[in-house]
Structure formats: C-alpha cells, structure tokens
Amino acid sequence: MQVNPNPNKLPVELNRTSLYLGLLLTFVMGILFSSYFFN
C-alpha cells in the first residue's frame, strides 16, 4: 500500500461529498414521496 502525502485531505472530501449526496438523495426522495402521497 502506498502512503498518501496528505492522508487527511481525501477522506474529508469523500465524507463531505457522500454527506451532500446523502442529503440530496433524502431531499429528492422526500419530494417524490410527498408528491406521491399527496396526489
């Protein structure tokens, strides 16, 4: 395994990206479910 020069940069960016993707997915699913149930 190769040692990264800056090991703290990549996991923080990946966690932030996955966090934003999770929030966006939850937001979209909430809109879809609300429009489906209230239609």
Curated annotation (Swiss-Prot):
**Keywords, sorted A to Z:** Membrane, Photosynthesis, Photosystem II, Reaction center, Thylakoid, Transmembrane, Transmembrane helix
GO annotation, cellular component aspect: photosystem II reaction center; plasma membrane-derived thylakoid membrane
Q: Which residues cross the membrane?
A: 18-38
* Membrane-topology descriptor: Single-pass membrane protein
Q: Name one GO biological process term.
A: photosynthesis
Q: What is its main location?
A: membrane
List, alphabetically, the InterPro entries matched: PSII_PsbL, PSII_PsbL_sf
- Biological role: One of the components of the core complex of photosystem II (PSII). PSII is a light-driven water:plastoquinone oxidoreductase that uses light energy to abstract electrons from H(2)O, generating O(2) and a proton gradient subsequently used for ATP formation. It consists of a core antenna complex that captures photons, and an electron transfer chain that converts photonic excitation into a charge separation. This subunit is found at the monomer-monomer interface and is required for correct PSII assembly and/or dimerization.
Q: Which NCBIfam families match?
A: PRK00753.1
User: How is this protein named in the record?
Assistant: Photosystem II reaction center protein L
What is the phylogenetic placement of the source species in the record?
Answer: Bacteria, Bacillati, Cyanobacteriota, Cyanophyceae, Synechococcales
